[in-house]
A protein has these predicted regions:
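Long, charged, low-complexity, helical-prone intrinsically disordered regions
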Residues: 1-258
């Protein structure tokens, strides 16, 4: 339920940031994601840097406003008569600037009021943000690789980077340390022409699966954006399941409609 996410956000157990896309992330991972944000090539962060370069004086003034006046919502700023918003959603300038500061880490989402984001200084929302530990990019990569494989259950190397949208593609040399220490295990999957990767925490489950001792207990309806199926190539290989979100498909190629 949305209310659960909002409660966890306001309780500072989660925070919002650009990861795979706009995500809720456990607060204990704040330093990891902030450390990686400086090299992340995600469009949300790249766009925020461009907005800052184009509107730096206005953005600095807005940041000072938040610093002295406190948390704000975009609705606190009135659109001037006849003014049209910019960008894809027709946002007013202040909304674009708030979102840019959020993507760049200066602002965080303190809570949501009726789905509207409430922005405040990062150090007021989460005090450790002022002096978080800067992790080397290589260390963050190793952590993200291990967590991605664990989340995916079983994975081919080419699927790993999409989980946290890390770049570039995972190299074999990055897998060796995790394989050597036993965090990841190479396994064979019938019908695959390359080794698969399994997190060691899933080894007991994999052994049960190999003995055909796992039984489905229930069915559920998934969003097309669910991590289980958002990688279409993985869904095809894993489940022989192919789909296309038709709102993103040219009209002439749609089967079912928008």
């Amino acid at each position: 339920k949305n209310i659960w996410l909002e409660q966890l956000l306001e309780s500072q157990l989660l925070f919002e940031a650009w990861a795979h896309e706009a995500c809720f992330i456990p607060i204990e991972d704040y330093a990891l994601h902030r450390s990686y944000s400086n090299v992340r090539r995600h469009w949300g962060i790249h766009g925020a840097r461009r907005v800052w370069e184009q509107h730096r004086p206005h953005m600095e003034a807005l940041l000072e406003h938040v610093r002295h006046k406190g948390a704000v919502k975009s609705s606190d700023f009135e659109r001037k008569d006849g003014e049209k918003g910019g960008g894809w959603w027709g946002w007013k300038d202040e909304k674009r600037w708030l979102e840019a500061w959020f993507a760049l880490g200066e602002l965080m989402i303190a809570r949501r009021d009726n789905f509207s984001r409430v922005y405040d200084l990062a150090e007021r929302v989460y005090p450790p943000a002022r002096n978080y530990t800067q992790h080397p990019v290589e260390e963050v990569h190793q952590i993200f690789i291990a967590r991605a494989v664990k989340a995916l259950g079983i994975a081919q190397a080419r699927w790993i980077n999409d989980y946290f949208r890390t770049t570039p593609k995972v190299k074999q040399s990055e897998l060796y340390p995790l394989l050597d220490e036993g965090t990841l295990i190479e396994v064979r999957v019938e019908g695959w022409n390359q080794p698969a990767l399994l997190h060691r925490d899933h080894l007991p489950l994999a052994r049960k699966a190999a003995r055909e001792q796992l039984n489905a207990s229930h069915a559920t309806l998934l969003s097309p954006f669910d991590p289980l199926v958002w990688d279409r190539e993985r869904a095809r290989v894993m489940f022989d399941f192919d789909y296309r979100i038709e709102c993103y498909t040219p009209e002439a190629k749609r089967k079912y409609g928008y």
